[in-house]
């Protein structure tokens, strides 16, 4: 009984143990691998806390969500994108989508897909809000005399030039599924399941940060987009609604990009 109580007491402070271990390993990494201390400590702490508090399903979904883009980047910059590369990409893509959906269903963080989770009016309102914040950021860009684009968008435009349009379009549209599953559902239903305010703030900032903002304009662009999508999920807790709004917005951007091209 004593040992059980002692272990239970120790479990309350597992975060302290994780952070201490992360700092120790980071110090070793600096001396052996010459890695940046603070970034290494932060990454190890986050990963350690995820496992310590049994949140590893989020980490799995996060890794899966990055596989298609990782494959595309490797193929595009190592050599000319071949037919075999395209086939491999779509195999990875399908496995990623299917695996992510099945993992999320098994973890019971999203319901089984059904038409009732696709309310047309709410989807239209969500899209309209994204369109509105896009106009606002465009006006802001004119006020500060800046080109209405971001480094992340420039990188995507460059990638578009060297990969097949089918691959680029698939990646763009799939972001609606993968990013909402990781940055909205994963944060609200796994990482901070019982802390809605922490969940909201984390989802808001993490989504914006992962899009690589480099200045005030890009932070505003992705921050406001994240605010709309995070607010939508916080209010309705409907993954399929968020996915639809995000996918529709990306489809709109894709069509505009193809027309301008």
From Swiss-Prot:
Its main location: membrane. GO terms for cellular component: plasma membrane. The keyword Endoplasmic reticulum does not apply. GO terms for biological process: CAAX-box protein maturation. It is found in: Cell membrane. The chain crosses the membrane at residues 15-35, 43-63, 84-104, 123-143, 197-217, 239-259. GO terms for molecular function: endopeptidase activity. Keywords: Cell membrane, Membrane, Transmembrane, Transmembrane helix. It is a multi-pass membrane protein. Signal peptide: none annotated. This is UPF0177 protein YvdC.
């Amino acid at each position: 009984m004593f040992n059980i109580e002692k272990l239970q007491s120790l479990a309350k402070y597992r975060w302290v143990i994780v952070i201490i271990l992360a700092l120790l390993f980071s110090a070793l990494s600096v001396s052996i691998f010459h890695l940046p201390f603070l970034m290494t400590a932060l990454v190890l702490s986050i990963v350690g806390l995820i496992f310590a508090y049994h949140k590893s399903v989020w980490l799995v979904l996060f890794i899966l969500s990055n596989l298609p883009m990782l494959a595309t980047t490797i193929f595009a910059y190592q050599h000319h994108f071949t037919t075999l590369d395209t086939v491999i990409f779509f195999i990875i893509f399908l496995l990623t989508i299917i695996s992510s959906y099945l993992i999320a269903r098994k973890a019971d963080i999203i319901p089984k897909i059904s038409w009732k989770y696709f309310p047309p009016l709410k989807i239209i309102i969500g899209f309209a809000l994204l369109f509105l914040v896009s106009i606002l950021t465009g006006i802001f860009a004119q006020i500060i005399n800046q080109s209405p684009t971001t480094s992340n968008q420039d990188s995507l435009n460059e990638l578009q030039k060297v990969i097949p349009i089918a691959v680029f379009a698939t990646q763009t549209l799939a972001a609606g599924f993968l990013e909402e599953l990781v940055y909205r559902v994963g944060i609200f239903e796994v990482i901070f399941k019982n802390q809605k305010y922490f969940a909201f703030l984390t989802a808001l900032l993490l989504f914006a940060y992962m899009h690589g903002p480099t200045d005030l304009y890009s932070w505003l662009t992705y921050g406001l987009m994240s605010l709309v999508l995070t607010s939508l999920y916080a209010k309705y807790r409907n993954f399929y609604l968020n996915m639809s709004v995000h996918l529709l917005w990306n489809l709109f951007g894709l069509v505009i990009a193809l027309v301008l091209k």
